[in-house]
A protein has these predicted regions:
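Catalytic core of membrane glycerolipid acyltransferases/transacylases, capturing the structured
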Residues: 1-16, 42-99
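N-terminal nucleotide/polyanion-binding subdomain common to many enzyme families
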Residues: 16-22
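A short, well-structured juxtamembrane/interface segment
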Residues: 23-46
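Short gly/ser/thr-rich secondary-structure transition/capping motifs
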Residues: 27-35, 102-103, 163-166
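A generic structural signal for alpha->beta connector loops
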Residues: 29-31, 68, 90, 150
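Generic preference for hydrophobic
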Residues: 34, 48, 71, 121, ...
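Non-catalytic C-terminal accessory region of glycerolipid acyltransferases
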Residues: 104-218
Length: 218
């Protein structure tokens, strides 16, 4: 019923996602500890950019953000029985092999932001296969979107999710534990033009890498 009109029921679907994330994590003994560099006014929209080393990163950000938001992610997430529920309703699938798909996805993201909803985008675009993981180069899309909408970016450092659950637990298994998430100060984009997108991308990458490396991924 909710899926028939996701726009109308956006808030309720987002709450269901949050409840599922909390219950599923609690059931397997995975908890999240959030550390804020500065208080966040969640009544405003943001583009949330985090490093991506584990599927648990998704749950971490679901539990972090109390306001309505959408993920943008690879189109394959439509085929997952859990993420598929939300990528068919409130989240935004992206097929990077199709310019039309990419245009439509970022148009939806733009609309969301202008409605006051945040966007969560993993700027690396994928989880790497190397173990231990490292921070890959960032895609330009989130940063161009932030400039076009003049919405602040919140850099997020997810320190140790990969140590608890990596590679779908095929190689090293999984274990209970506490995932440490660092919420950095929002980066204001007001006054920036698209000519600043590359610099903004590199600044966010360096910031996340600095804090992740400093903590040793712990």
């Amino acid at each position: 019923m909710l899926a028939k009109n996701p726009e109308r029921h956006f808030h309720l679907i987002a709450r269901c996602r949050r409840i599922i994330g909390f219950l599923s994590s609690t059931f397997v003994g995975v908890f999240y500890r959030f550390r804020y560099e500065t208080p966040i006014d969640w009544s405003k929209p943001y583009i949330i950019c985090a490093n991506h080393t584990s599927n648990l990163d998704i749950t971490a950000l679901v539990l972090l953000c109390p306001s309505d938001f959408s993920f943008m992610g690879k189109i394959e997430l439509l085929n997952n029985p859990v993420t598929g529920m939300f990528f068919k309703t409130i989240d935004i699938p992206l097929n990077r092999q199709s310019r039309i798909s990419a245009f439509k996805a970022f148009k939806r993201a733009d609309d969301n932001l202008r409605k006051g909803r945040s966007m969560v985008i993993f700027p690396e675009g994928h989880i790497g296969e190397e173990f231990p993981p490292h921070l890959y180069d960032f895609k330009n899309g989130p940063f161009k979107l932030a400039i076009e909408t003049q919405v602040p970016i919140i850099p997020i450092v997810i320190h140790n999710a990969w140590k608890i659950f990596w590679d779908e637990a095929k190689t090293f298994g999984s274990r209970p534990g506490i995932i440490h998430v660092q919420v950095l100060e929002p980066i204001v984009t007001s006054g920036l033009g698209l000519e600043h997108a590359d610099r903004l991308r590199d600044d966010v990458h360096q910031l996340i890498k600095k804090h992740w490396t400093k903590a040793g991924g712990l």
